[in-house]
A protein has these predicted regions:
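Non-heme di-metal
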Residues: 1-204
């Protein structure tokens, strides 16, 4: 299904280590509104999305979120590569280091491990798409918060790219919701669950 290209979706070229920045950016790897949760959310939801166009949107965006997770991991890796024990202690990276050395491990900025409870796959297209719309806005806000904390242009450049993609994803999920609602009863979108209650094979 996937063709992997051996390059990042957007370049990440960071010349100076910064473990303090790494500790907050890692939240977009394994935090509640990060790229790992996003990719798992969309790639799980697509199986019970009754409309092919919307399934395609979920697949496209879920796949792109995997690429974004790779970018976040590259950023964190470059920010911590080659740190000395003295630097690790000085900048408060020691707690992470004890458990993971300098390996990538999904956690929030708070240190909370990634968990599948960060996302839902409900099997109702209206419910799932509203979750997706909210998820993209929460991710955008997180990137906004990161950009307020960091002023290194080498870090900010790929972060701004990722933030902009969240806006695009939000717009595409809005399109997916419109497609879904157009296929439902306009007087009551909630009259039935088109995934569970409609006859199998119906694309109406």
């Amino acid at each position: 299904m996937w063709n992997y290209e051996k390059r990042l979706q957007y370049p990440v070229k960071i010349s100076q280590t910064n473990p303090q920045a790494a500790q907050i950016i890692i939240s977009q790897f394994g935090g509640p509104d990060g790229e790992l949760a996003a990719s798992m959310r969309y790639l799980s939801q697509r199986y019970t999305m009754p409309y092919k166009e919307v399934t395609g949107i979920l697949t496209d965006i879920g796949t792109e979120e995997l690429a974004h997770m790779e970018m976040i991991c590259a950023i964190v890796y470059q920010l911590t590569k080659g740190l000395t024990p003295e630097e690790i202690k000085k900048y408060g990276f020691d707690k992470y280091y004890v458990d993971h050395t300098l390996a990538l491990w999904p956690q929030a900025a708070s240190g909370t491990p990634w968990t599948a409870t960060y996302f839902q796959s409900k099997g109702d297209p209206i419910t799932d798409l509203h979750e997706d719309l909210a998820a993209e806005q929460k991710a955008r806000t997180t990137y906004d918060n990161i950009l307020r904390m960091i002023n290194d242009p080498e870090i900010c450049d790929p972060i701004r790219f990722l933030r902009q993609r969240e806006v695009v994803h939000y717009q595409r999920f809005g399109e997916a919701l419109r497609i879904t609602q157009d296929k439902l009863d306009s007087k009551n979108f909630y009259a039935f669950n088109p995934e569970f209650d409609m006859p199998k094979g119906c694309d109406c």
